[in-house]
Amino acid sequence: MDEIDEMFSNLLGEMDLLTQSLEIETLPPPTRSASTTEINFSVGFKDLNESLNALEDNDLDALMAELVADITDAEQNVATYNNKSTAPFPPADASNSYHFHPPPMPSIITEDLSLLPPPPEFDPHYPPPPPDPLTEPKTQEELESKAKANKINLALSKMKEAKVKKRIVKVHMIDSSTKTLMVEEHQTVRDVLDNLFEKTHCDCSIEWCLFEVTPELQIERFFEDHENIVEILANWTRDSVNTIHFLEKNEKYAVFKKPQNFYMATKGSADLKDMNEKNKVSLLEQSFCGASVTVPELEAALYLKEDGKKSWKKRYFLLRASGIYYVPKGKTKTSRDLACFVQFDNVNVYYGTQYRMKYKAPTDHCFVLKHPQIQKESQYIKYLCCEDPWLLHQWVTGIRIAKYGKILYDNYKTAVQRGGLASHWSTLGSSSVSTAAGSSQGNGQICQNVTTISSSFSDAWKHGEANKQEKKSSEVNKPETKSATPTVTKRPPPTPRRASSISRVTDHPAFPPKPKAINTDIMSGPPQFPPPEPLQPADDFLPPPPPDFFDAPPDFLPPSPPSFMSNAENPPPPPVTQLQMSNAPAPPPPPPPPAPAANVPPLPVKKHPPKPPKRQSIVGPMPGTNAHGGAGGQPDFMSDLMKALQKKREPPT
């Protein structure tokens, strides 16, 4: 029996080897591999159990004869099947089948393939894909069931919302007013602070906090930003008189502003106040962002209140990450001798107020450790007293760091980020509101002096307008000077011409100092004449050349040239000036040298801008005055005066 089994296993192994070689040569599709092995295994046998039973009765020779007969039949069937199925198969497969068909051994395995149905990949007709459930039209029952499911989901969501715990919180402001808020159970203290920032329009500083006050125990503390305010309020009793205040406390995040005061104060560092921002950040990262949070090393002698008594005992306490430890009497400060005073898992730290009066404490700088659910005096409350306020601040901050760890640092970074965004948006939103500094509003906060965009824009606009006005004024003054110079330059030419004409008429280059008195008389004589147009440019003090100003007095003299004397009865002053002006360009003789030499020295003395234009303005009316004087019946007086002046000017013989 063992020999038969061994021969049968050898036969099956040979058939497997033939199957593998056929797969390598013909490269059939991968989907046929499993089925071919199964058929190869069952070739010549309808039932494996029956064949095994038959092996016991039949001898090996008969079995081999049957196997050879089956192999020949299979070879014939494969040959006929390949002849029939060459057309639908690809030419490559057909050529391979023709090429590998003649050998007898591969035909044994191809018989197995002939028993399989055609592979699905060669079937040109595939079944249609299943319809899309989204695009498939739904029946009325399906629509009704879907609507019912939606209603059930909506009802469940509303039930969940109804189960959310909500509390009405009354927050006390600085000016004794209150704000009422609706707080849900998922809201943290940070969310409530952001809500209060929007309502009160404060400066969104990180020092703002919610401050819990428990009057019955005379304790108080500020809530941490990550705490759930609904859970905190759930610990209060129904008849509790505890209050929540919206205050600004610098102690909340002082450790992150000056970490050297808490982590390096006990090391005797001398440059605590001179630490730069980079070193501060590195110290904070090292203390809070490592594998474990570094708790400040605090060791001090504190006063402990005895249970049920108003007496205090001095003990030496040490702060560790797991809690507060103290040194028992007669023991050292080694770790094995330390006794655990309290752990921070289920306690909060509070500030004590007026404990010197209530419990006869050595100082008023006390802090309390108690469970949050304890709202009345109990033996489980721990009272500790410090000698100075700075030591109290160090211990309370160290306990907070040991209890909350890195969460405290995350709260600080979140407060800084939100505070910056809130202040930015509040500044943009308050551009339309401007109130006086220090005035109290109805929201319970003191108005802050916030520089709005509108005010800064108006200031910038005013500054720009002022600069524009200065530029315009400078530009306007420049063209005026340019326009004034030609008007003044136009005025000097007549004066030298008149002086030259007078000199030619009188044959004298200069006059004695008497013309000054004559000038005053003439100026006071005709007040009815309007001033000429070039008065305004004369106010700018752009005088003509010096000789022109001091040659003008001879024009004001009453005596006129001989042509004037001959035409005294018909005085046409404008034509005379026109003739002078018209004749002036043709003969432009320079003034005689003595006249400018004599007139140059008084320049600094007679630098009065109004007088030169007035003298020039009277040049035109002067002949008119003479004409009017002659018409008044006084021509003889004028002629006598002219003769007297000529006699005085004649050199003595």
Swiss-Prot record:
GO terms for biological process: signal transduction. Coiled coil: none annotated. Residues 165-253 form the Ras-associating domain. Residues 462-481 have a biased composition (Basic and acidic residues). Keywords: Cell membrane, Cytoplasm, Cytoskeleton, Membrane. It holds the Pfam family RA_2. Belongs to the MRL family. This is Amyloid beta A4 precursor protein-binding family B member 1-interacting protein.
